[in-house]
Amino acid sequence: RLGAFIPTPGVDLDKIQEFLRTAQGGVFGIINLFSGGNFERFSIFALGIMPYITAAIIMQILVTVVPALEKLSKEGEEGRRIINQYTRIGGIALGAFQGFFLATAFLGAEGGRFLLPGWSPGPFFWFVVVVTQVAGIALLLWMAERITEYGIGNGTSLIIFAGIVVEWLPQILRTIGLIRTGEVNLVAFLFFLAFIVLAFAGMAAVQQAERRIPVQYARKVVGRRVYGGQATYIPIKLNAAGVIPIIFAAAILQIPIFLAAPFQDNPVLQGIANFFNPTRPSGLFIEVLLVILFTYVYTAVQFDPKRIAESLREYGGFIPGIRPGEPTVKFLEHIVSRLTLWGALFLGLVTLLPQIIQNLTGIQSIAFSGIGLLIVVGVALDTLRQVESQLMLRSYEGFLSRGRLRGRNR
């Protein structure tokens, strides 16, 4: 949060914040949300970590299209390390482009409308903005990688999670202020809060829901010992893709808004920005479609029925009533496709409903939008699972170390 209070040199923050409160500035809401409110402060983290996520989406597409990258992705840990390095470079390059674009098309527009006295739009100011934003993105990437490596959970997701959650209290306080002035009805506000609580409960239940496919292992008699014969299961989650499709959908939705919104005097570009604005019906519909699409795509990447079927056959396992090999692959594909359909429809519904409730109650808050709530719930549950697994691992380590100590004392 310290970086949120380090502004970009030469930018008039009061004018930026005043503009973002207008109808024209409202299209920047989703960019401001995923930067943790840093865009309205135009701090060194104004672009957030979204340039890196956009680069990651582009890289995943290139891996499936470019044979050299596809081959590299199959070379194990070393190949993944090189692809990650390419993604980092792409994220920083994209951040530099976005910083330059903002400096020229937005901040420097109309003779420097958003600049402090003594500053003027030109090469020096453009250079300062680009260097500041690239440094901010590089620092966020470094922190995300350190969190992933030494902390608990995915660093990139946790940074986005923190950026959304930190906006909740200001949004609630702002709404309470509107209640006092009579602009928002108290009953509508209580209804909105009740819906948020129910939405959290429903999302958590669906994120945890899974279909358990029974697996039986054949018995093997070696001498006087019997091996195998255990019964277990394959857990397939209703939402196997997790929170990644939602983050990817938000990243894609930001691109046309980011490119069109700064041109305030161009009605065509403003129309494009408004069309993709997730608070409008058109933008909300596109957002739902993107969430459903990325859910299917990422589930296909994460869950490989062929690999699971081969693993079962290798270790003597089988699904009761299903023959090993190709029948098992087809059975798993059928189950996954059905679960993914319902999971994707649920994610689409949850993306849609909060905006409808906001329109009905008159409480507009992008921090409590469907996409924001889904990210918060998904990241929180993923992190909680990792914390539980770490605690379990530590308890086993403690048990084993005590056993070793007792053995030495004998």
Regions from the language model: what does each represent?
Residues 1-71, 78-410:
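N-terminal cationic and glycine-rich segments that engage phosphates or anionic surfaces
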